[in-house]
Amino acid sequence: DTSYTVMYLAKEKGYEVYAACANTGGFSAEQLKTNEENAYKLGATKYVTLDVTHEYYEKSLKFMVYGNVLRNNVYPISVSSERIFQGMAIARYAKEIGADAIAHGSTGAGNDQVRFDMTFLVMCPDMEIITLTRDSNLSRQEEVDYLNSHGFSADFTKLKYSYNVGIWGTSICGGEILDSKQGLPETAYLKQVTKTGTEQLALTFEKGELKAVNGEHFDDPIAAICKVEEIGAAYGIGRDMHVGDTIIGIKGRVGFEAAAPMLIIGA
């Protein structure tokens, strides 16, 4: 959705597009490099990564650990808790460069559109908010066809799903999620099962913060969380489905994989 937005605004509308990725811990250095390369291929004038991982941890994530927070006793609020911090980072950058508008790829299906729109309206009230996918009611296939027809080649095999990756888990939307009774196939998950059997996991907390994993001490709690995620994801731990009420008044169904949250909260 965002890729389509960048290309369409640059090629069809003549916008000078500044592409920004607000990273809350979900991207590796390699993935961020790919984001940058793709942004320029799509027609962006400039690309930046805005790292807000530690801000997110200090102002939100650690309190969810303190409170063992699970929405409806199922969902660790994986990506939804990050959206405000991503939105604020984008808004600050938009003001820094003197942007006339802010565009995002929300589809209109759930809560993210509200989180982003409200953040931008509060922090950048004079800027136009552009949401092509939502306002034009575009299907994912229409966007893929447009990108292909304009020479942008990529692996679109998983584009039946929409992934939002963060340090506190990955949400998966689309495909079987749109049916009330189907589960996700193994191939839908970004992190594949590579281990079977059992393994001992020892977590050490100091004043509610994760400080050590299997005796290995971490000065940075974020690094400790990533270590737990690496261990648990290999076994497919933390995969589930959540159904809840959205801000816009409809039921929302989302799949997720969140090994670290489920292990840490369980501990």
Which positions does each model-derived feature cover?
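Nucleotide-activated chemistry modules centered on ATP-dependent adenylation/adenylyltransferase
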Residues: D1-A267
